[in-house]
Amino acid sequence: MELLILKANAITTILTAVTFCFASGQNITEEFYQSTCSAVSKGYLSALRTGWYTSVITIELSNIKENKCNGTDAKVKLIKQELDKYKNAVTELQLLMQSTPPTNNRARRELPRFMNYTLNNAKKTNVTLSKKRKRRFLGFLLGVGSAIASGVAVSKVLHLEGEVNKIKSALLSTNKAVVSLSNGVSVLTSKVLDLKNYIDKQLLPIVNKQSCSISNIETVIEFQQKNNRLLEITREFSVNAGVTTPVSTYMLTNSELLSLINDMPITNDQKKLMSNNVQIVRQQSYSIMSIIKEEVLAYVVQLPLYGVIDTPCWKLHTSPLCTTNTKEGSNICLTRTDRGWYCDNAGSVSFFPQAETCKVQSNRVFCDTMNSLTLPSEINLCNVDIFNPKYDCKIMTSKTDVSSSVITSLGAIVSCYGKTKCTASNKNRGIIKTFSNGCDYVSNKGMDTVSVGNTLYYVNKQEGKSLYVKGEPIINFYDPLVFPSDEFDASISQVNEKINQSLAFIRKSDELLHNVNAGKSTTNIMITTIIIVIIVILLSLIAVGLLLYCKARSTPVTLSKDQLSGINNIAFSN
């Protein structure tokens, strides 16, 4: 029974994953750099998606024209209910096919040939529903971007004349075949469910008998289980507007997925990697509704191709690094902005700035190169020497010292500033460490939570070795007066250049001010000198005048003898 098979596959997958987890081992190490308030988690191995593998999955359907049975037996009623669900599901898929972008006009014209099912709703309602689905589908496509481009391309080809019949013919005597499509692409096609033969040859002959009786309940249960897969596939496509991710076990059971992986044109190491991590593979895969035609439902499954595996990967964690002046509002902050996942890739480094897009299983990192940037290997120098001349390390600046914590693989970075209380606690012993102002690090050994103000952080319990690399916080090297604030996408050289510009401006201002002051001093000296000279001259003139005056006053008047005799005195001359 298929439900039991699904459960068995799920259990097998879990056991395989657990076995792989223990077999792979944990060699994770972590280094915290006090100088830059950052930590690097090492010891991971890569699994980078570099391409897509597309396969066509088919389900053969039955064209149920009528149900003659009108019996009242409980088992017959259950069968009739399942048949109604089946017909409604097929109708839903027909409507969905009309509203998806890959459908062309020819396929739409040929749609009525397939089955005679119609919804009980009016035609106007169907048109409205179709328009809503189309808008939703287009919105979803904008969300996934170009990720499903290859799958959509294959889906479009299936709408061409004769493509479905070509696939149907190839799967007549087998459940798996390679089919060459009209665009020259060969795809692996698989028939995962044959409802047509089951309904036409086993079920309908029973329920359409004159007696309308079913001898055992197993027939009902078997049809419910087979029908359930179609109903779930229909529901997923309907809810997700024709494109679903991850790929569920209804789209592909675990055994079908493992079989498909085994048929992929990849190395044995790649097959082993995918087989041991089927849940991650499902999360990074897509199923795309294609066509329902010629009594066949066809949809495309798009699986990731991991072209780069087993290269070293590491994750960079960063937190704000600020000065710790007691005066509020006088601090400056610097934060590294190059946090994310890094993996070696063909002599360079693939950088994934959005770390959450990568999936981690044990020490394996699954990332999509579509979300990556290619950087030189010198990027590693930023961890040990942020001022290195070979690579310009990325930072951001601010003057807001906000306290926070960043949970790393093996501990936590704590940025504690101002009057915020920051502590690390053990669930049994309580607070085991109180952080002082600044940036600090604590490993997860013997520690369960970190508290920053009113925010509580739970640390990871991954095992590994932590190393604390001490160093002078680089923020202390900068002068708050010339430190540029609110640089959100800058580098060390750009910040230093702005600081140098500020210093040059200050020096120029000082020179101008000095020159102005020097000019003023010279003028003042000249004026003072002139005034002093004038005063000296005036004083000299006054002194000479006084001297002459005094000299004149001190000289006696002497009369001659004639003047004294009066003979020649003018007063007596007449």
From Swiss-Prot:
Transmembrane regions listed in the UniProt entry: 525-550
Intrachain disulfide bonds: 37-439, 69-212, 313-343, 322-333, 358-367, 382-393, 416-422
GO MF, any single term: identical protein binding
Residues bearing a lipid moiety (S-palmitoyl cysteine): 550
SUPFAM superfamilies, per the entry: Virus ectodomain
Outcome of swapping residue 313 to S: Impairs translation or folding of the F protein
Reported impact of residue 322 to S: Impairs translation or folding of the F protein
Mutagenesis / variant outcome for changing residue 212 to S: No effect on F1 and F2 structure and glycosylation
Mutation effect (residue 358 to S): Impairs translation or folding of the F protein
Recorded consequence of changing residue 102 to A: In strain: Cold-passage attenuated
RNA-binding as UniProt keyword: no
Reported impact of residue 37 to S: Impairs translation or folding of the F protein
Stretch list, region Fusion peptide: 137-157
Any coiled-coil regions, as ranges: 76-96, 158-209, 481-516
Keyword vocabulary terms for this entry: Cleavage on pair of basic residues, Coiled coil, Disulfide bond, Fusion of virus membrane with host cell membrane, Fusion of virus membrane with host membrane, Glycoprotein, Host cell membrane, Host Golgi apparatus, Host membrane, Host-virus interaction, Lipoprotein, Membrane, Palmitate, Signal, Syncytium formation induced by viral infection, Transmembrane, Transmembrane helix, Viral attachment to host cell, Viral attachment to host entry receptor, Viral envelope protein, Viral penetration into host cytoplasm, Virion, Virus entry into host cell
Family assignment from sequence similarity: Belongs to the paramyxoviruses fusion glycoprotein family.
Full protein name: Fusion glycoprotein F0
UniProt source species: Human respiratory syncytial virus A (strain A2)
